[in-house]
């Protein structure tokens, strides 16, 4: 822009000088036709006046050049100011972007940790919550819960049981009131079945094959037991101190053992170790090879360990006749502990 202004003033100045010189030449011709003396006098005046006119023109030109320089400086200053403002704006934008990114990161962390925070609400029993507080803070547990939170949130494939029922087994009886522990492998993977208790299904859901076989064994083992045909809800056992624990507490729909590598085994092993250290006598019932691998965790001689095949139809012949229910009651009675009423009504 400054270059255009300078060109304009230079052209204007040149035009002014040319016009002044043309006027002087016209006057000079007019004076010559009058008289020689006048011509001489006029010529002298012109000679004397010419330097003044040229000086005035030069001065005017210098003013224009000075004005151009000031204009250039002003424009440069404006450009510098614009650059400065742009830098400030860029810095502000960068800060804003960083703050937004940090906010997103915090929000993401909060989102990931929501499930972990909710666990405080899922554990309603204070004794269990206190006993397991050390596990909640471990890296494997936080990683597992974060992973589970994403799986539950994505809804690509249903996860069972619902989040608020994962720890149901811990909320039916205080740690000090546990009498019998029955270890399962992982939850039922059919819709509407699992609710946090091993081998149990929700109200209104027909008993699965393994539970039907458990009922069959009870019919031959416990006098007066009548097998319910439509009720597989084992809550009455849980309320009496039967701890129905799966080694893995979650599963994807129609995909058994899908969460076996999530870290649940570390958690439930810690649970079993805590139970093993309890002074009150406990019966540990281990059905099948998977559950029997946990036997090494029970080093307390106060407890009783019972083993047999799994109640699944695939291994039923190694399960039927084990009499684990009557044996559990005999042990509890011998220790002065109230026996379990194994009855399940329709």
Curated annotation (Swiss-Prot):
Composition bias, kind Low complexity: at what positions?
A: 30-42
UniProt EC number: 3.2.2.27
- Region annotated Disordered, chain positions: 1-105
- Which residue windows does the record flag with biased composition (Basic residues)? 43-64
Basic and acidic residues composition bias: residue spans: 20-29
Instruction: Give the main location.
Output: mitochondrion
Q: Which InterPro entries match?
A: UDG_fam1, Ura-DNA_Glyclase_AS, Uracil-DNA_glycosylase-like, Uracil-DNA_glycosylase-like_sf
The active site is formed by 186
For this UniProt entry, the molecular function terms from Gene Ontology, in alphabetical order, are:
uracil DNA N-glycosylase activity
Q: Which domain of life is it from?
A: Eukaryota
Top-level EC class, please?
hydrolase
HAMAP family linked to this entry: UDG
Compositionally biased residues, Acidic residues = 67-86
Q: What does this protein do?
A: Excises uracil residues from the DNA which can arise as a result of misincorporation of dUMP residues by DNA polymerase or due to deamination of cytosine.
**Annotated compartments:** Mitochondrion; Nucleus
Instruction: Give the gene symbol.
Output: uglA
Name of this chain's protein: Uracil-DNA glycosylase
CC per GO annotation: mitochondrion; nucleus
Keywords on record: DNA damage, DNA repair, Hydrolase, Mitochondrion, Nucleus
């Amino acid at each position: 822009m400054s270059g255009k202004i300078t060109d304009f003033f230079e052209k204007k100045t040149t035009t002014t000088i040319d016009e002044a010189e043309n006027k002087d030449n016209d006057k000079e011709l007019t004076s010559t036709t009058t008289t020689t003396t006048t011509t001489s006098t006029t010529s002298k005046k012109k000679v004397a006046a010419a330097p003044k006119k040229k000086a005035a023109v030069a001065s005017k030109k210098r003013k224009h050049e000075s004005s151009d320089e000031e204009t250039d400086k002003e424009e440069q200053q404006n450009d510098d100011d614009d650059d400065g403002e742009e830098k400030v704006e860029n810095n502000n934008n960068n800060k804003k972007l960083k703050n937004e990114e940090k906010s997103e990161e915090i929000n993401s962390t909060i989102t990931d940790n929501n499930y972990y925070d909710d666990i405080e609400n899922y554990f309603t029993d204070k004794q269990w919550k206190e006993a397991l507080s050390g596990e909640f803070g471990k890296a494997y547990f936080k990683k597992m819960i974060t992973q589970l939170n994403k799986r539950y949130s994505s809804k690509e494939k249903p996860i069972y049981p619902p989040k608020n029922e994962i720890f149901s087994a811990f909320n039916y009886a205080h740690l000090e009131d546990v009498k019998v522990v029955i270890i399962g492998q992982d939850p039922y993977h059919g819709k509407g079945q699992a609710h946090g208790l091993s081998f149990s299904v929700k109200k209104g859901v027909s008993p699965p094959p393994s539970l039907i076989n458990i009922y069959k064994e009870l019919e031959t083992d416990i006098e007066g037991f009548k097998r319910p045909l439509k009720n597989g809800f084992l809550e009455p056992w849980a309320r009496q101190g039967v701890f129905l624990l799966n080694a893995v507490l979650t599963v994807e729909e129609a995909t058994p053992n899908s969460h076996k590598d999530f870290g649940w085994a570390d958690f439930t092993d810690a649970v079993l170790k805590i139970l093993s250290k309890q002074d009150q006598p406990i019966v540990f019932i281990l059905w099948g090879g998977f559950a029997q691998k946990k036997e090494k965790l029970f080093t307390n001689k106060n407890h009783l360990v019972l083993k047999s095949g799994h109640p699944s139809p695939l291994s039923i012949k190694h399960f039927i006749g084990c009499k684990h229910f009557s044996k559990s009651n005999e042990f509890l009675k011998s220790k002065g502990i109230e026996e379990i009423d194994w009855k399940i009504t329709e």
